[in-house]
Amino acid sequence: MPNPNQTIVVRLRNWVGDVTLAVPMLQRLADAGLDLRLVGKGWARDLLAGHGWPVQVLPKTMAERVRLLRDMGRDARRDGSLNGLCLPDSFSSALEFRLAGLRALGHAWEGRSLLLARAVPRPRGVHELEVYWRLGSALLGQDAALPAAIGLHLADSHLAQADGLRHKHGIEPGCILICPFAGGTWNQVDKTWPGFADFVARDLQAFGRRVVVCPGPGEEAIAQAQFPSALMLPGVGLGAYAALLRDAAVMVSNDTGPGHLAAAVGAPLVSVMGPSDPALWRPWGPTVQLLGGDGQWPSAQAVRAAVARTLLGR
């Protein structure tokens, strides 16, 4: 097990869902006394602000990334112990740690074993949260039971931003949030529920609640065209988004990052999955109702019933 206060430079992954699912492992390392120094996408700093970990923005070029990793690890121990944690499985991410002179732990994947100070097999057939949890166990040298919930911390600034949005747009408590978007595909199959627009127009409006959508960059036109009845809040940061979710009556989401975000703050979530494998990628937590998956989309009636169970208790 690393010594208390030992500096560990952590390279985060590039998707909101992945970073969210890694939060319990990162908090476990911090609770063990490790000095975490994170590097990832620009949005990760806002997402993780409530935990107080410093997050550097990942540069675009390899030379800049190596220079940044070297600077971040300047205070790390150089006695042969591990001082890096590489969460991505790419060859380049392991190479950057090696060129920066850091001894990183990561998955034995794509011929990376010679670049990492310690390479462990990537588990197959387990949920992605457990994949990261096991990496934390390997770093600490001890196993621990999987957490029941993610427990994403919100910063005071996140709560203030969410309050400002509610006041500005007249959003009352008990609204419904939707995330009808989906980044990427599953085995080259679109993860966007084909019935989402009709469901919002015909079924969700019947509950008499304000419906809110927070499109990400490039999603505004889809939100406006396909979900005209919803209040659109573009440009909302992930921290404020999480704070809005925490106080929502329910969220209905595709298999995408904001769905994991809702589960991470304990919001009631109806997770609509189609091609994805729920055993590997379902949102994690006790407030999740999972519908579909493994190549099957749920019916609108099933999604409506799940929303009704949350809102009406039946």
Language-model features and meaning:
Residues M1-R314:
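Catalytic machinery of carbohydrate-active enzymes
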